[in-house]
């Protein structure tokens, strides 16, 4: 139901209950639920069952008295057509035609902002996601993070937050050294399997590409950095490192462009060392008495804050363990004014949560114990041509986001092994990401079609199907189908959707409306609450679930009630319902970064 209706009905029930309570008694919280069976009405409330024992009253009798209060109230008479008592004392309400009409009127009035709320008055939130090491192409796990993080950020924006999207680059440490050594070996003419090929080297074809461009003196640049030119010096490992990191950051920028994801800031791990923030964090923890020395290593007392054992911060060789810069990084988030932070990461990072939080607590900066929040996702398995794909020629050991977008786009060139995204970038094609809209839409929607904490199988063959089996096609087809109806109406009668705002909606919202029409209106009414719940629970998958349900309700209505009928009032009412459905489909798809095509 509409949030305004929910608030009114909650207050209505509370007021009815209040008249039955002894003076000075606190009113209980009113919880409204949707009955599991449509035959039981639109809203269910168990407040009579909650109060019966404290008041020493039969719950059905109490429910009937509450129902009488609702029926006698003018607000109830406007929004509620029937109040029924079920079972031991459940109060079931049926919404009135007026309430259903209000839903469609709200969609017409609010348009592209239907479902949005200003609940948080611009309160800042930082969402960190993807945060890949610049040691290779983005893999499908990063793709899941990108889909989850960007949709979550949009959800929070729709609830009135000012959202800051951040990518943290782990550009320091052993893995970056291994990258530089790998490129150096390629530049010297070695390849994987050769004697002299480094044991910890990266084996993908991209390493050879980096080496070739370095030796050719090419210039590369990440979106937020300075250009770096290949020095051609095979012995200069630092020059190789700088070139390789910048090269791969640029490659990841291209993947993110194709995926339609933009970040407000890229934060480099190396800057934490350069600015002295890592050392400052360690010094502060030592000064606070949160550390101790043992066997030549520095330990953090993480058990003081709920960890199962204390953790090493500085190893005996003097190097820091990987969670130490993470603690320093999160102090910068807090210091920049982000009192709410959400990290989207793979489930393999679960072990670092307690360590980072313990480090933050040890610094005594006033940071809450549950800071930051985490959304952890499980792995993605890719299926293609009926078999699991484990290796990418491009990456060497995993399927990349670029692979997935190109395959799901259905390009013959990609099937033949051509890197079509790279080809578009190098040719300078204008608006090149638009060419990959189909692939991007499929990857984004699919990666949101399961809860983050469940493993997901991405079936490329299914993503290419133009049938109801394909969830993104099913939802987008609903939007395109509605657009087609409006094209027909315009061609026949010159009809314009804008003229439907004042239509008589009795045929879809009144007592004679079909069950399919009523169900569709109810689904549209649920959109604002769904967005609010998804944002509160950090659950962007709920939007994809909702869109599939909305598309299903639309298709059921369309198959049951012919739209372009001779009766003008009925036709306009049904067209108004289609216009509202199209708007909500468009809004929901916008939240998750998927297009709403007019033709398919």
From Swiss-Prot:
<dbReference type="InterPro" id="IPR009080">
    <property type="entry name" value="tRNAsynth_Ia_anticodon-bd"/>
</dbReference>
<dbReference type="GO" id="GO:0005524">
    <property type="term" value="F:ATP binding"/>
</dbReference>
<dbReference type="Pfam" id="PF00750">
    <property type="entry name" value="tRNA-synt_1d"/>
</dbReference>
<keyword id="KW-0547">Nucleotide-binding</keyword>
<keyword id="KW-0030">Aminoacyl-tRNA synthetase</keyword>
<dbReference type="GO" id="GO:0005737">
    <property type="term" value="C:cytoplasm"/>
</dbReference>
<dbReference type="InterPro" id="IPR035684">
    <property type="entry name" value="ArgRS_core"/>
</dbReference>
<protein>
    <recommendedName>
        <fullName>Arginine--tRNA ligase</fullName>
        <ecNumber>6.1.1.19</ecNumber>
    </recommendedName>
</protein>
<keyword id="KW-0436">Ligase</keyword>
<dbReference type="InterPro" id="IPR001278">
    <property type="entry name" value="Arg-tRNA-ligase"/>
</dbReference>
<dbReference type="GO" id="GO:0004814">
    <property type="term" value="F:arginine-tRNA ligase activity"/>
</dbReference>
<keyword id="KW-0963">Cytoplasm</keyword>
<comment type="similarity">
    <text>Belongs to the class-I aminoacyl-tRNA synthetase family.</text>
</comment>
<dbReference type="InterPro" id="IPR036695">
    <property type="entry name" value="Arg-tRNA-synth_N_sf"/>
</dbReference>
<dbReference type="Pfam" id="PF05746">
    <property type="entry name" value="DALR_1"/>
</dbReference>
<dbReference type="InterPro" id="IPR014729">
    <property type="entry name" value="Rossmann-like_a/b/a_fold"/>
</dbReference>
<dbReference type="GO" id="GO:0006420">
    <property type="term" value="P:arginyl-tRNA aminoacylation"/>
</dbReference>
<dbReference type="InterPro" id="IPR005148">
    <property type="entry name" value="Arg-tRNA-synth_N"/>
</dbReference>
<dbReference type="InterPro" id="IPR001412">
    <property type="entry name" value="aa-tRNA-synth_I_CS"/>
</dbReference>
<keyword id="KW-0067">ATP-binding</keyword>
<keyword id="KW-0648">Protein biosynthesis</keyword>
<dbReference type="Pfam" id="PF03485">
    <property type="entry name" value="Arg_tRNA_synt_N"/>
</dbReference>
<feature type="short sequence motif" description="'HIGH' region">
    <location>
        <begin position="132"/>
        <end position="142"/>
    </location>
</feature>
<dbReference type="InterPro" id="IPR008909">
    <property type="entry name" value="DALR_anticod-bd"/>
</dbReference>
<comment type="subunit">
    <text>Monomer.</text>
</comment>
